[in-house]
From Swiss-Prot:
Capsid vertex-specific component that plays a role during viral DNA encapsidation, assuring correct genome cleavage and presumably stabilizing capsids that contain full-length viral genomes. Participates in the interaction between the capsid and the tegument through interaction with the large tegument protein/LTP. Pfam families: Herpes_UL25 (PF01499). InterPro entries: Herpes_UL25 (IPR002493). GO terms for biological process: symbiont entry into host cell; viral genome packaging; viral penetration into host nucleus. GO terms for cellular component: host cell; host cell nucleus; viral capsid. Belongs to the herpesviridae CVC2 protein family. Heterodimerizes with CVC1. Interacts with major capsid protein/MCP and triplex capsid protein 1/TRX1 at the pentamer vertices. Interacts with the large tegument protein/LTP. This is Capsid vertex component 2. Residues 1-50 are annotated as: Interaction with major capsid protein/MCP. The gene is CVC2. Keywords: Capsid protein, Host nucleus, Host-virus interaction, Viral genome packaging, Viral penetration into host nucleus, Viral release from host cell, Virion, Virus entry into host cell. The keyword DNA repair does not apply.
Length: 579
């Protein structure tokens, strides 16, 4: 019987044995054992010896050829290795030369650094200090400080009295005294660390109060890459470019923008005077959250901010894009015909002068926009307060005597050349905008350089105090009314609450304070500061009104020289004899 091995379809012819494939050997059939040693295969090789001889001859010839090829490759192998190693050796040679050059340069740099350190050490010894310094009045010496300029100055004042916090002979005016008395009466637990025995004003209380005044322009909610002060400077600069493209000053950095702030504010005031019939420095509070500064979802209700004249001017000059929903769809197509009306110029200016690779769209973050408008308004108010201020008047009319404080603190005699103070020689001198110009160059710019996140209220806590006190003036009647009011503490409940929380924070852990309560009280102080800004800006002669109503006397301010230092320091100290 003939054997057949099935791989595909299987048929059954007659007299055939079929060997089926299995899954074990996949497609190969299950061959019988010793199948390939059958006589048929053995006899086939033995029957053709010539074929076997030819096969062996060919195998030998192939082996000889392979050996010849191997011998030839062996001969050329060193040459090939040299050819491939030569570029690597050249690269190593170049790297060695570069390393030698770097080593030489490093040695020269170390030598130069040593010389530079020696020069720096000599310069430090010459200057006797490496602390940052600012200067407020042109006819006074610069002031050096460590971390917080205002707090360090208060510490200097108490050291100057030579008794530290135990001295009853330092007064800061009725406003601060009333705040301390109200704090002790209303918040006795928080006031445990306040030493007010024998009528003394506590240094702890003064430091805490000034710190709270500085925080009135900072946002406690959210983390932003740009401060409101930076956005305000950029807005004023873009407005200036739009109005004075021909006479634009050359600026290369954000510090230069700060130095030119008086020109920008002057142009802004001229524009407001020319194009606005009646300026309004208040928002539409009916459309704003009542007790909250932060905007839910990033935006307030439509029309909540556009009632402010500063906001309206920035939109009209196309510094800011139109507010969402400000125009109907048909009108919007006409205004945005070139598809450029909604391009945010602040974003471009921030990229050019700040270079932080972060977006800033004020119309999308209207909480930051609101604080930016407040900062611009505060700059305008500061300009009005310092306009034509005479810092060269009679010295004895000034309650602030810098020379006395510095002399007492350092234990060295006062240098009349360095600490001139007011001279009385130029009593009729009209400074115009010079005092504000000098502050921008020697006070605001250095403070910003040292702290890029600083806000305007941190630089001018005295300005915040005047804005908070404006509510007292409103409740007592017209700003021009001549009245002495020393009961202003009852109108500062929000500020007293914030001071109490800060004092408790210093005695307890951070996690033990209610965050929601801190944010709520801080927002109430921010809102009071914002409303006070509007009240003071609506006064046609704000400085004269403050003087006539004796509101400046609440802070020991008696002259233009005192006012200049008060807006920067937040306090005007006076030494009194011990009773």
């Amino acid at each position: 019987m003939t054997a057949r091995y099935g791989f595909g379809s299987i048929s059954f012819p007659n007299k055939c044995g079929i060997f089926l494939s299995t899954t074990k050997n996949f497609i190969a059939p299950n061959f019988p054992i010793h199948y390939w040693t059958a006589p048929a295969f053995e006899l086939r090789g033995r029957m053709n010896p010539d074929l076997e001889k030819n096969t062996l001859t060919l195998k030998n010839a192939a082996a000889v050829a392979a050996l010849d090829n191997l011998r030839g490759e062996t001969i050329t192998l060193p040459t090939e290795i040299d050819r491939r190693l030569k570029p690597l050796e050249e690269q190593l040679t170049r790297m060695a030369k570069v390393l030698d050059s770097l080593e030489t340069a490093a040695a020269e740099a170390e030598e130069a650094d040593a010389q530079s350190e020696e020069c720096t050490r000599t310069e430090i010894i010459r200057n006797e200090s490496i602390h940052p310094e600012v200067q407020i009045a042109k006819n006074d010496a610069p002031l050096q400080y460590d971390t917080n300029f205002q707090v360090d100055f208060i510490t200097l004042v108490y050291l100057g009295r030579a008794r530290g916090n135990n001295s009853p002979g330092i007064v800061f005016g009725p406003w601060y005294r009333t705040l301390q008395e109200r704090l002790v009466l209303d918040r006795p637990v928080a006031a445990r660390g306040v030493d007010c025995k024998d009528g003394r004003i506590s240094r702890t209380f003064m430091n805490t109060t000034v710190t709270c005044l500085q925080s009135a322009g900072r946002m406690y909610v959210g983390d932003r890459a740009y401060s409101a002060f930076e956005c305000a400077v950029l807005c004023l600069y873009l407005m200036y470019r739009t109005s004075n493209s021909v006479h634009e000053p050359q600026v290369s950095s954000f510090g230069n923008l700060i130095e030119h702030l008086p020109e920008y504010t002057e142009t802004f005031v001229n524009y407001m005077t020319t194009h606005e019939n009646k300026n309004s420095y208040q928002f539409c509070y009916d459309r704003l959250p009542r007790d909250q500064f932060h905007a839910r979802g990033g935006r307030y209700d439509q029309g909540a901010l556009t009632s402010h004249s500063v906001m309206d001017a920035l939109i009209r000059l196309q510094v800011l894009p139109p507010a969402p929903g400000q125009f109907n769809p048909g009108v919007n197509d006409i205004i945005d015909r070139n598809h450029t009306a909604y391009v945010d110029k602040i974003q471009q200016a921030a990229a050019a002068y700040l270079e932080r690779a972060q977006n800033v769209f004020l119309m999308e973050d209207q909480t930051l926009l609101r604080l930016t408008i407040d900062t611009i308004t505060a700059l305008l108010l500061l300009r009005r307060l310092l306009w034509n201020g005479n810092v060269y008047g009679d010295k004895l009319k000034n309650n602030f005597q810098l020379g006395l404080i510095v002399s007492e603190a350092t234990g060295t005699p006062t240098n009349n050349v360095i600490l001139r103070g007011a001279t009385g020689f130029d009593g009729k001198f009209k400074s115009g905008n010079n005092n504000f110009q000098f502050l921008c160059e020697r006070y605001i710019a250095p403070l910003y350089t040292l702290n890029r996140t600083t806000e305007l209220t941190e630089m001018f806590p005295g300005l915040v105090a005047l804005c908070l006190d404006a509510h007292t003036q409103l409740s007592r009647g017209s700003l021009g009314r001549t009245v002495i009011d020393i009961s202003s503490g009852q109108y500062q409940d929000r500020l007293i609450s914030l001071i109490a929380l800060e004092l408790e924070h210093r005695r307890q852990n951070v996690t033990s304070l209610p965050i929601a309560a801190v944010v709520s009280i801080h927002d109430s102080v921010m809102l009071q500061y914002e409303r006070g800004l509007g009240m003071l800006m609506h006064q046609p002669r704000v400085r004269a009104a403050l003087e006539e109503s004796r509101r400046l006397a609440q802070f020991n301010v008696n002259s233009d020289y005192d006012l200049l230092y008060f807006v920067c320091l937040g306090v005007i100290p006076q030494f009194a004899s011990t009773p």
